Amino acid sequence: DARIEHVKKQITPFPSFASALKALGIDYGNLIESDLRKKGCGPKDNPWGHFEKLLNKEIKVDSAVYNSSLPTYRISWEGQTSNVRERLITLSRFELESDVIEHFIDDVESDILSNPYLISEWCARNFIEKVSTRTIDLGAFPDPTIQGDNVPVPPFAAESILDTRRLRSLVVERLYSVLTDGDTLVSIKEMEDYLRDIMTEEDKARLLRLCS
């Protein structure tokens, strides 16, 4: 479908870049991202490299309201461990609010670098409905029409809708969904039927895209 392809071309591979900056305590994240776009950061580029250039004065934005804060931002960024920086970059691949990103910056025991579906599991347990397994799919499945040259790679990437990490996330979502509805027990058969229905639905959607 041409409309789907058009939408994909407009999607950045790092949709929560500005939210990640906010989680780090950096103000004006949306403005910084907008200025970086104007200074050569394309829609499929990784904005984090451009952000470092801004901090190092390799990119200059005249009269920007945040210019006086850039030295402080640089200290904050360079003061983070490589693990925290990598987690921030990873988290920015998904459509997340800054409070969710902040949680996973602090929760260094959560191995989101190997299993990004831990994010949707945690959100399900905390009834954060804006983030689902499918939210993570968009950043975990390699798709050059969305991510350009920044496609995810193993062990982070998901290669199949049957990825066990993904299936576990779907199961956790279902369990907490029925809990909200007042049910406390779900049979194995009910869960199998639920997963089978999802897989069938996704297979049909994929076939329609291939035929359109």
Put a short name on every predicted segment:
Residues 1-212:
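Helicase P-loop NTPase motor core of nucleic-acid translocases
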